[in-house]
Amino acid sequence: MKLTPEMLTGKSREHLVNLPTTHSSNHFLQTQAVQAFQALQQSAAKNGFNLQPASSFRDFERQQLIWNSKFKGERKVHDDAGKALDLNQLDDWQKCQAILRWSALLRLVVIIGERKWIFLILIFCHEVNLYNWSLGNMKKAATSLN
């Protein structure tokens, strides 16, 4: 399927399917990404991990709401160490930089059609065993997307 500008900017969901999970029915991915994620989940389960999605596709309106809430200080924005920032101390450009510190990569994943979502696992792997397991399975999972 050729991705349209509407798909790439979160204005359309026609290229997405629901990712069934036990915790939420609000995760949407492209068909190939669902298949790859489910294969990764099965592999993780065999190795003792309960791998669940933390985030997935967000439409434009939802992403705009999140951005605006952060910019206005209604939602927390964190520094590199994960400590909440006082946005009242920042000018508008600094606020944008602070928000993008944790948001840019996630939005980029949606923009490029979610074909690279698998690499996000490295960002969220704070446990050494899960990190090592994910490194070992990255190439295999990425290959299944092709």
From Swiss-Prot:
It comes from the Bacteria. InterPro entries: Bact_PeptidoProc_Enz, Hedgehog_sig/DD-Pept_Zn-bd_sf, Pept_M15B. One of its GO terms (molecular function) is peptidase activity. Pfam families: VanY (PF02557). One of its GO terms (biological process) is proteolysis. PANTHER family: D-ALANYL-D-ALANINE CARBOXYPEPTIDASE, PEPTIDOGLYCAN L-ALANYL-D-GLUTAMATE ENDOPEPTIDASE CWLK. This is Uncharacterized protein HI_0101. It comes from Haemophilus influenzae (strain ATCC 51907 / DSM 11121 / KW20 / Rd).
